Structures are given as C-alpha cells and as structure tokens.
C-alpha cells in the first residue's frame, strides 16, 4: 500500500469523503477541505503529489476551524500553516529524516522518494524544521 492509499484509509476511517480528479476553477488550487470532504485537483500528476495534498487537507480537517479560504486574515493564515505543519509532521517528521539518512539517502530526490513525498514538499518541510529548530536538534 502506498502513502496515498494509506492516507485514503485514514480519511475513510475518520468519515472523510475524497473526491479525486476535481476540476477547480483555478489551476492554482490543488486541494480543498470542506465539511468532511476533501477534493483533489485533476492536475495532480501522480500518487505522490496526491498524497502530499491529501496530507495537508487532512491537516486542515484536524487543526482548522471554520472557513479559512480568505488568506488576508492573520488567523486564517495561522490555521493554514497549522494544517501544513500537521502534514509535514505526518509525512516527513524528524524521525523520517533520520530514517532516510540511516537508509543511505544521499540527496533531496532520494530522501523524498524514500519518504513518499515530492521534492517540493520535502524542501518545504525542511525549511519549516530549520526555522523551528535551527540546523541541529536532539531527537529522543
């Protein structure tokens, strides 16, 4: 079972419907969560991209309250970030980075492939962890 299928199972267990290959009015929208339904864009190319977007939308399910589409609001931006952080921790995490290293992943591509995420998602998560912890931290 790949990462996308695992996330689909998690969503199903939580009573969340997933609409795959949705046509959004804007190509900039890759996913949307509303009322226990997650819609994923038809423009997502593969299961890895779908997994990254689904993880973030699940993060919104678990962490957001209300309609956060209007990103001009500081509170909505904070909730957007919380959903993204949930996805980073769920799909990558510090332990995942360590495991990738222990499995001899040598670069961003190998690490992303090992973790089942896109290089962009991994890079964004690494930026988040660097901002939070600096270049070094201890993990129990």
Label every model-predicted segment.
Residues 1-140:
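Active-site hotspot residues in diverse enzymes, especially metal/ion-binding acidic/histidine motifs
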């Amino acid at each position: 079972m790949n990462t996308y299928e695992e996330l689909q199972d998690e969503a199903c267990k939580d009573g969340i419907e997933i609409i795959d290959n949705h046509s959004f009015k804007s190509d900039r929208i890759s996913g949307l969560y509303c009322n226990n339904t997650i819609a994923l864009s038809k423009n997502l190319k593969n299961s890895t991209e779908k997994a990254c977007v689904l993880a973030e939308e699940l993060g919104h399910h678990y962490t957001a309250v209300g309609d956060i589409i209007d990103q001009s609001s500081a509170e909505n931006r904070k909730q957007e970030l919380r959903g993204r952080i949930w996805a980073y921790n769920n799909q990558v995490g510090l332990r995942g980075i360590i495991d990738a290293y222990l499995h001899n992943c040598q670069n961003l591509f190998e690490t992303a492939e090992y973790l089942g995420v896109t290089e962009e998602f991994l890079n964004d998560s690494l930026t988040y962890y660097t901002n939070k912890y600096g270049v070094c931290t201890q993990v129990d």
